[in-house]
Amino acid sequence: MKKVFRLVAVVAATVMAATAFVAPATAATKVKVGLAYDIGGRGDKSFNDSAAAGLDLAKKNLKVTAREVTVTTGSDSEREDKLRLLAKAGYNPIIAVGFLYAGPIKKVAADYPNVSFGIIDDSSVDLLNVAGLVFAEEQGSYLAGVAAALATKSGKVGYIGGVRIPLLQKFEAGFVAGVKATKKSATVDAKYV
């Protein structure tokens, strides 16, 4: 639960930081945040839900308006279409959830230089109007590893990652480091599904 709360807090801070790119809102100009989810969208019980929770906090606390879009096929062209839809509709900033948006956001941001974009889990886009929103994921999973090491009676713990990608390998590395720092003799069985 603490990990989820931390991620929600990070996403809320991300949305708040992204709105700092935009001129202060007045009664006549209200900040319109666009949020582009990856496959699964709101309700995925994962990264998209964390972004949604942050957006909900921004809507409540900052009084921003927002539009949410979700890709269904996962193609770069669909991601690009979703970003263009938000940019054409005047949303600024636009935040994309996940590194798979890197190529599409680079194209769209180049066409909309006066719109601020943010991309979660990627810092490869080198444009002035794109903020790479990357986090030290391994630090949170380190703490989870410490907790697992303290909880195990057998000296064995497991780590399950969804897909073997660099991001989840960072989670695994942090988790294993936390386990080993707490209980050197413990073994970690890591699997990806």
What are these regions (language model features)?
Residues 90-98, 118-120:
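Periplasmic-binding protein-like
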Residues 1-11:
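Bacterial N-terminal signal peptides that target proteins for export
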Residues 110-134:
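Flexible loop/hinge segments that line or gate small-molecule binding clefts
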Residues 62-71, 183-193:
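Short beta-strand elements in bilobed, periplasmic/extracellular small-molecule ligand-binding domains
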Residues 76-90:
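Short, well-structured alpha-helical segments in soluble
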Residues 55, 142-190:
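An alpha-beta-alpha
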Residues 8, 17-25:
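C-terminal segment of classical bacterial N-terminal signal peptides
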Residues 33-61, 67-80, 98-101, 164-170:
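Extracytoplasmic "Venus flytrap"
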